[in-house]
Amino acid sequence: AMTMGDRIMLLNDGSIQQIGKPIDLYNNPKNPFVATFIGSPPMNIGDAVLSKDTKEIIIGNRVKLEIPEKDNHLLAHDSLIVGIRPENIKAATTDTNLTEKIYVEVENVEVLGNETVFSFKLNEHIWNVKWSGQWRINIGSTIPIVINFESLCIFNSETKQLIKAPTDIEKHIIDDKEVVM
């Protein structure tokens, strides 16, 4: 779908879900259907609850991320749906703060030449990670990853509509104009 046109319309059961440039649907999907339709592997989706006391979003009872003050409006909800693109889940390093590391057990791994895709289970959901390059990762290994709040798409769990788009997307576009080097 990303290469089929300048603008696309995504339908689900005959109902228009979103119209726009493919990259806009990819970066700012209006709902989880659009999020999981566009992209390979698709966006990871999971249920989340909010802790109003600690001002954290808790994904799958395991991943706890602090909510920045500018996003405190999210605390008005009890539960949300979160999404993150596989390429936005990062590898933890020795410099990564211990509280930011999330240890996951590898369920499957594919080294595809210029990238490595592996999966892990977060509650009942299988999530995918896509890293550039060739990584020596074995099925059954436990590895540390990092999920940043800024990388999340957050959807209202009742309306399924996007209420927070990712804010850390790398964009290499200059005013929709051709770049001459």
Where are these regions (language model features)?
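Hydrophobic Walker B segment
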Residues: 2-5, 37
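A cytosolic small-molecule/anion-sensing beta-strand core signal
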Residues: 4, 12, 84
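ABC ATPase "signature
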Residues: 11, 16-21, 28
